[in-house]
Amino acid sequence: MITVREDTREETLILDDGLMIQETLERLAAKEIFSRQAAYCCYVRSRLCREALCTAQSFATARIVSGDALELI
C-alpha cells in the first residue's frame, strides 16, 4: 500500500507496479478524491526515495515500494 497526498487530501492505495503514476492521479481526480489539477501533475515527491519523480512512468520504474508516501509537487 502507498499513500498519495495532495495538500490536505490523502488517499491510501494498493500498489500495482504496472500502473503508471499519471494514470493513478487521473483516476483520483476523476473520482473527485483529488483536485482536477492533480490529473496534470508532472512530479511527485517520494518519502522513501527523498526525490522528485516524474509521473510519466510506472510505480515499478520509479522504484516506489509498499509503505511509501507520495506528495504531489
Name what the model sees in each region:
Residues E6-E23, L53:
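Short, contiguous acidic and Ser/Thr-rich linear segments
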Residues M1-T3, Y40:
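Short structural boundary motif marking the start of a folded domain
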Residues C49-E71:
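Eukaryotic mixed-charge, acidic/polar low-complexity intrinsically disordered regions
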Residues D16-A38:
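Short amphipathic, charge-patterned alpha-helical segments
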Residues E11, A38-C42, S66-D68:
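A generic structural signal for short beta-strands and their flanking turns/coil linkers
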Residues R5, R45, E71:
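Residues in well-ordered beta-strands of folded domains
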Residues A30-A52:
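Short loop-to-beta-strand transition segments
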